[in-house]
């Protein structure tokens, strides 16, 4: 096992032969990525971290197994939050242009924030789309920012204002709600 691959936790009951009954949760980070495998009762069986862009046979083996459920949280750099009433997918090329990106190198994905009636648009490089596409449907990828905003919006019921600071891999994300409305992310 390489020093770029870390097994954080492994349960004695974990076996790859039962993978079709398991859930695979992946955090696709900027420098490091992490996967966790849970059983039918949501008990953690395996927690594994690896440095991105390093070919690790064990990671490839685990990614290629069939799972009951797969969820991928993508640590995106580019994000646009657009009210649902203004969003139309026919304008995707313009959204990419706003981010100074092109279709040749990036793919625009969207995630609906139902609680706030907002579309969260985020980009994934085509290189990462191709890598992840070997194992999963691109529709299984969700923006970390969208999940964070959606979760926080459910926590503000009785608060007039709410500030969240999320630290990750040397960066910080600030999310601010006032009067139950998203003000800043």
Region roles according to the model:
Residues 1-185:
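Hydrophobic/aromatic-enriched cytosolic interaction surfaces used to assemble or bind macromolecules
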């Amino acid at each position: 096992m390489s020093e770029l691959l870390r097994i954080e936790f492994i349960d004695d009951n974990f076996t790859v032969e039962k993978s079709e009954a398991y859930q695979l949760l992946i955090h696709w980070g900027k420098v490091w990525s992490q996967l966790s495998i849970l059983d039918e009762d949501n008990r953690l069986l395996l927690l594994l971290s690896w440095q991105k862009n390093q070919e690790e046979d064990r990671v490839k083996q685990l990614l290629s197994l069939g799972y009951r459920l797969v969820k991928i949280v993508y640590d995106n750099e580019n994000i646009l939050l657009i009210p649902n009433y203004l969003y139309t997918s026919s304008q995707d090329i313009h959204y990419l242009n706003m981010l100074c990106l092109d279709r040749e190198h990036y793919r625009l994905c969207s995630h609906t924030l139902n609680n706030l009636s907002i579309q969260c648009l985020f980009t994934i490089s085509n290189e990462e789309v191709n890598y992840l596409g070997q194992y999963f449907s691109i529709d299984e990828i969700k923006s970390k920012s969208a999940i964070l905003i959606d979760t926080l919006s459910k926590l503000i019921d009785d608060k007039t204002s709410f500030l969240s600071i999320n630290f990750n891999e040397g960066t910080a994300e600030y999310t601010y709600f006032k009067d139950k409305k998203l003000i800043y992310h």
